[in-house]
From Swiss-Prot:
HAMAP family: Thymidylate_kinase. ATP binds at G11, L12, E13, G14, S15, G16, K17, T18. It catalyses: dTMP + ATP = dTDP + ADP. One of its GO terms (molecular function) is dTMP kinase activity. GO terms for biological process: dTDP biosynthetic process; dTTP biosynthetic process; dUDP biosynthetic process. This is Thymidylate kinase. It is an enzyme of class 2 (transferase).
Length: 234
């Protein structure tokens, strides 16, 4: 019996994390690993979900500073790790997470250009030697990922208006359907992706998946890599 593990899925907006998580949980179940819980960052606990709303939506017209954003993300992360993830692992459950601290290194370190020393200090103080056992990084060009996000936002607006029997142009609704991270300029996501790729290339526990390929090929590669990794854990 394989000891409980913490598997994380990382990637830019529109990279297909939701699909990957579903695929991984399904594959684990087929391998006889039934006790699997799902978490997401920021979020996963009542407090962390409240922080997620603040991070994603902000408060009125007040600008959230980069450092304030980072600290809110870390507060949510610490709450999730200490109250959900660690207890689950100790009780024998596997945990599949939508993002972990690699996101902070990429988004806040790369995208926001926050000093890496600050990010490392936060990890060392609060997470210490707690790391995911395996991370899948879904790599996708920002322009492709954002196109997927905007397409989904358009569909949601169309469905909503169909239900409410409203006819209108949805060009103005798309931006309103995106959160404060998703409306960042393409240069922000270029920097974030560059940092992701840099970090992934230096860590053997991070597997890079080309998420620009078809869903079928992405799922096939995830299956191949996950099963190969599981064999090494026996």
């Amino acid at each position: 019996m394989i000891k409980s593990k913490f598997i994380v899925i990382e990637g830019l907006e529109g990279s297909g994390k939701t699909n990957a998580i579903s695929k991984i949980v399904n594959l684990l179940n087929k391998q006889g690993i039934k006790n699997v819980i799902f978490t997401r960052e920021p979020g996963g606990t009542p407090l962390a979900e409240s922080l997620r709303t603040l991070i994603k939506e902000g408060v009125g017209y007040e600008k959230i500073t980069d450092n304030a954003e980072l600290l809110m993300i870390y507060a949510a992360r610490i709450q999730l790790v200490e109250s959900v993830i660690k207890p689950a692992l100790e009780n024998g459950s596997w945990v599949v997470g939508d993002r972990h601290d690699l996101s902070s290194l990429a988004y806040q370190g790369g995208g926001r250009k926050i000093d890496t020393k600050i990010l490392k200090m936060l990890r060392e103080v609060f997470l210490r030697d707690f790391y995911p056992d395996l991370t899948f990084y879904l790599d996708i060009p920002p322009i492709m990922g954002l196109a997927r996000i905007r397409a989904r936002a358009t569909v949601r607006a169309q469905i909503r208006d169909k239900v409410n029997k409203i006819k209108r142009n949805h060009s103005h609704d798309i931006k309103n359907a995106l959160d404060r991270i998703e409306v960042e300029p393409i240069s922000f996501f270029d920097r974030t992706r560059k940092k992701y790729k840099e970090l992934a290339s230096k860590n053997e526990k991070i597997i890079t998946i080309d998420a620009s390929k078809s869903l079928e090929l992405v799922n096939k590669e995830i299956k191949h890599q996950l099963l190969k990794w599981l064999k090494k854990q026996i």
